[in-house]
């Protein structure tokens, strides 16, 4: 496994790869969710590239860029065990040199939910992913369903800019108690960690109501909110029942919908989602 920090050196390594190339973009501090993407990429491609880059342009001024967990030696050990071809781990100056000024604005799909709660977030995400696609030129790129809106943003960007990359979305990987795996879970103290299962419990509640025949959007949102309101440490940013294609809030679910939520547990903001299918 090669570890490369510069675009020039990476491009030389990429030129020597023949066959299908899969890309797994990450911000590091890897967990089993990331590794599930790596294994899927390994099964479907001749070569696998993992990028590790904590992207500053997707963090707001009051967000957790400075304390976002980082442990490159640990990440590299995990990836070595997965038999990855190349890890591309640039620094900020390599990705955003002096004078950098071009950003990708994806449009309406980036506006609601995470886009409303974190202004500028998806502008940063789309820009860095576009750059990584251009640098690594993969045939396929792998993302997790936990960041559902992000996957829609990246699909839209790839379509609109005619990027020759197949976007593959993989299932959420959960802890035994249902908490979606996230690098930010490390922020939680033991009491907060127990409370954090409220996100999964809220999704279970809305799925149960949906299976029982409830299709009213407000009633489904209320089912999630009731579970969150019963947890003293939980403070919701949003609960949503939205169209799976464009994320507009639904009055009534007629086919498929995305049930999603963002909740603060202490100072830690967590997200989760599930798909409701009629």
Curated annotation (Swiss-Prot):
Binding site for (R)-pantoate: 58, 150
Function: Catalyzes the condensation of pantoate with beta-alanine in an ATP-dependent reaction via a pantoyl-adenylate intermediate.
InterPro entries for this protein: Cyt_trans-like (IPR004821), Pantoate_ligase (IPR003721), Pantoate_ligase_C (IPR042176), Rossmann-like_a/b/a_fold (IPR014729)
UniProt name for this protein: Pantothenate synthetase
GO process annotations (BP): pantothenate biosynthetic process
Family annotation (HAMAP family): PanC
Cellular compartment(s): Cytoplasm
Binding site for ATP: 27-34, 144-147, 173, 181-184
Pfam families: Pantoate_ligase
Enzyme class: ligase
Pathway annotation: Cofactor biosynthesis; (R)-pantothenate biosynthesis; (R)-pantothenate from (R)-pantoate and beta-alanine: step 1/1
Enzyme Commission code(s) on record: 6.3.2.1
GO molecular function, one term: ATP binding
Organism (species): Roseiflexus castenholzii (strain DSM 13941 / HLO8)
Gene Ontology, cellular component aspect: cytosol
